[in-house]
């Protein structure tokens, strides 16, 4: 053994002695599988597409409908005339309410699309949109947007017992 080998062995001995009480770190990181992340991404994208479908119906420019400001109502099919009568006298109570006053047109349209998506998912029949007074921009636009959506059966300016002329009550055809 030469001098450098003995020095090296002493250094190694001291090194092992210093690190003898040290234990290996336990790995506690949980790695998500790629499949789980893909499934989550697919669910998120599916939900976004469903909301965009309803938003597309609202922003479609196929036809223009004008409404009389005294009595705002809409009926998709004449077969639902008795439903409109019940809607006018206040027999239907909204199962979900959306308040859009204070929002601009695009935000209100997106929120209305989300509301219609929720109504489809949870099979809600009656909903209400509160547009407020303001400059009557949303008051004029919401009936037009609702009339463009194929699932809306009928709507009517809310009866006095539900909030006067600041909201619209509408009925949605269930998907089943």
Curated annotation (Swiss-Prot):
Disulfide bridge partners, by residue number: none
Annotated Gene Ontology MF terms? RNA endonuclease activity; rRNA binding
GO:BP terms for this protein? Answer: rescue of stalled ribosome
Give the matching Pfam families. Smr
Concerning SUPFAM superfamilies, the annotation shows: SMR domain-like (SSF160443)
Q: Which InterPro entries match?
A: Smr_dom, Smr_dom_sf, SmrB-like
The chain positions of domain Smr read 98-173
Query: Which keywords belong to this entry?
Result: Endonuclease, Hydrolase, Nuclease, RNA-binding, rRNA-binding
Q: What is its EC number?
A: 3.1.-.-
User: Function of this protein?
Assistant: Acts as a ribosome collision sensor. Detects stalled/collided disomes (pairs of ribosomes where the leading ribosome is stalled and a second ribosome has collided with it) and endonucleolytically cleaves mRNA at the 5' boundary of the stalled ribosome. Stalled/collided disomes form a new interface (primarily via the 30S subunits) that binds SmrB. Cleaved mRNA becomes available for tmRNA ligation, leading to ribosomal subunit dissociation and rescue of stalled ribosomes.
| Protein family | Belongs to the SmrB family.
Summary of subunit composition and partner proteins: Associates with collided ribosomes, but not with correctly translating polysomes.
For this entry, the protein name equals: Ribosome rescue factor SmrB
Higher taxonomy:
Bacteria, Pseudomonadati, Pseudomonadota, Gammaproteobacteria, Enterobacterales
Encoding gene per record: smrB
